[in-house]
Amino acid sequence: TFESNMMGTLNMLEAVRACPDVGAVVMITSDKCYRNDEWVWGYRETDHLGGYDPYSASKGCAEIIAHSYFKSFFGDPVNAPYCATTRAGNVIGGGDWAADRIVPDCARSWAAGQPVQIRSPWATRPWQLVLEPLSGYLWLGARLLLGLNEPFNLRSQAYNFGPAADVNNTVAEVVEALAMHWPGFNSEMDKAGQAGMKECTLLKLCCDKALACLNWRATLD
């Protein structure tokens, strides 16, 4: 985890430094990069980075590394590359069959007639279809590449991309919604599965900056 998220970020940025043809860089980390204080409101881009588990800590480290490079090497207001980081919520979408993903895990478990293991059924997450943050990444990258930096400074900034704060759902609610489309399968949840893993309960993102600077908002339910 640390090697991928920290050293991977560092290696990529070093490659950008060595390539004069790069015009813009949009780095994607995670909403888990924030120090989670179990707030009921959404985290803003200026809130503390950190993490109480290795994954979250590694994402916070990736953000710190990225912004140190932005300020040290990519801060020229005239010359490219122009850079930014993005922090997206929990994405759902086709093509993701990895382990420890809520939709693929449900599909595999129910197809086998087994209850799906849920680590934190009452935890809330900023769920969104993968096309939502992708649209934000592409729009941000296009504006950086074209030098569209007015009226807000987009360069060397961080942006949250997530759903509206009032549509955050619990893991259990997502599983129950999926079960409605799987008649005949075992929709029981094994709520003791992997209970020893450290996970935060409340997680929301404030995406006001993306709305103000990029005119971006989530549009899908």
Model-derived features with residue positions:
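Amphipathic alpha-helical segments in well-structured domains
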Residues: 5, 9, 99-104, 137, ...
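Residue(s) in the substrate-gating loop at a strand-loop-helix junction
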Residues: 30
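Short, well-ordered alpha-helices that flank and scaffold nucleotide-derived cofactor binding pockets
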Residues: 14-18, 67, 71, 108, ...
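Short aromatic-enriched loop/helix-cap "lid" or pocket-rim segments at secondary-structure transitions
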Residues: 37-40, 96-100, 130-131, 171-174
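C-terminal substrate-binding subdomain of Rossmann-fold SDR/epimerase-dehydratase oxidoreductases
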Residues: 90, 110-221
